[in-house]
Regions:
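Bacterial N-terminal signal peptides that target proteins for export
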Residues: 3-20
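Ligand-binding pocket segment of bilobal, Venus flytrap-like solute-binding proteins
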Residues: 184-249, 255
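C-terminal motif of bacterial Sec signal peptides marking the signal peptidase cleavage site
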Residues: 27-32
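Ligand-binding cleft/hinge of the Venus flytrap
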Residues: 63-68, 150-210
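Periplasmic-binding protein-like
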Residues: 128-136, 195-198, 205-206, 236-267, ...
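N-terminal segment of the mature folded domain
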Residues: 39-166, 304, 362, 366-367
């Protein structure tokens, strides 16, 4: 069972800046129900700071964690928002024991700030706790007949996506569009031209992936660039939309890490997230569970699930279809981290460095201030 209560006060670990204090005002709290005496609380509290998309999955995992010996006396405070904004807020002092962010570079910022150990990604899954794929959300009946990436740059097709300047989800979207060209025989110049045409068609450039979904559900645009799990979760919430899994797309790999001065229970939490029950809950909320041997391929039997258990999937018999060309950071873009593409695509031009290809495409489209 999960109940709500007020967030715990700021700890003495880091002095929060005004930015961190403002963000903390929006924090939600989940608490595992225990059997302690009425009015008394001996709970240890884990502060989770994450990007917006996995909030429902983390809530479900917390409910299962509360049933274990390690989690029965553990409560949670949570804060969710755009990945880059959340990472910067933690660096500025927002209280956190565990971060669940969209891209590894947002964790790297915390490593450089001395808040997360440099060994955070040394485990068998290299710091990744959840995965999904980039899909193309469309209107009922797919009136624009969107079958893949090339349809998004046609005249009259209106696209909704988050802004890569604030959103990690948007960076995965842009990387998938880039890879559609470069990993199918195109040159980087052709890929840059494709991105320019794509952002010319963007009609809503939101702060986070969740905001992009909300915008699309509100009637904006013809196509939504989204995580597959966002489409599945929307259907679970009675707001489903059709989506296309492109023949070429990217495996989204979301990192999780505990902070250097985290409460001891945070390590138990991370172990649970990476374990069978944690990954099972991710699957039930539309994420593709971790699979080191075959990334992006779901082994239902190992999780005690049947395909039909994934409510809201477009095809109940095949909720996580095999992608013909599933690109990964490590194999296709100079990974395992973002170093091979971060500055090339998303450089902000500070300190005299050149602006990235995606940054320029957005500026040239006139959408940078949306």
């Amino acid at each position: 069972m999960v109940t709500a209560r007020l967030p715990r006060p700021w700890g003495a670990r880091r002095r929060p800046t005004a930015l961190a204090v403002a963000l903390s005002a929006a924090a939600l709290v989940l608490t595992g129900c225990g059997s302690g005496a009425s009015g008394e609380s001996s709970e240890e509290t884990i502060s989770i700071v994450g990007f917006a998309v996995p909030e429902a999955a983390n809530k479900a995992i917390a409910a299962e964690f509360a049933k274990t010996a390690a989690g029965e006396d553990v409560g949670f405070t949570t804060s969710y928002g755009a990945s880059g904004d959340q990472s910067r807020a933690v660096a500025a002092g927002l209280d956190a024991d565990y971060v669940h962010l969209s891209v590894g570079s947002d964790v790297d910022r915390l490593v450089e700030a001395g808040l997360v150990a440099r060994t955070w990604d040394d485990g068998p899954h290299k710091g990744i706790v959840s995965t999904s794929v980039v899909v193309l959300g469309v209107r009922d009946g797919n009136p624009k007949d969107v079958q893949g990436w090339d349809d998004l740059v046609q005249p009259g097709v209106e696209v909704v996506t988050a802004n890569p300047a604030s959103s990690g989800a948007a960076r995965w979207n842009a990387l998938a569009a880039w890879g559609h060209v470069t990993e199918n025989g195109g040159t980087e110049a052709e890929a840059a031209d494709f991105l320019g045409k794509l952002f010319d068609n963007v009609v809503s450039l939101t702060n986070s992936g969740r905001d992009a979904t909300t915008s699309f559900l509100g009637g904006t645009g013809d196509v939504l660039l989204a995580y597959e799990n966002e489409a599945i979760l929307a259907a679970q919430n009675g707001q489903g939309f059709e989506y296309v899994v492109p023949e070429t797309t990217v495996l989204i790999e979301n990192p999780g890490a505990i902070l250097e001065d985290a409460t001891p229970a945070a390590a138990d939490w991370l172990d649970f997230v990476l374990g069978t029950e944690g990954q099972r809950q991710f699957a039930l909320k539309g994420f593709r569970p971790l699979n080191a041997a075959q990334p992006g391929v779901v082994d239902f039997a190992s999780l005690g699930l049947d395909p039909a258990d994934i409510e809201g999937a477009q095809d109940p018999g095949d909720p996580f279809p095999v992608v013909p060309k599933l690109l990964t950071l490590e194999r296709d873009f100079g990974g395992p981290g973002w170093d091979g593409v971060k500055d090339k695509l998303f450089g902000d031009g500070q300190d005299g460095a050149p602006k990235g290809i995606v940054t320029l495409a957005i500026e040239q489209s006139g959408k940078a201030t949306q």
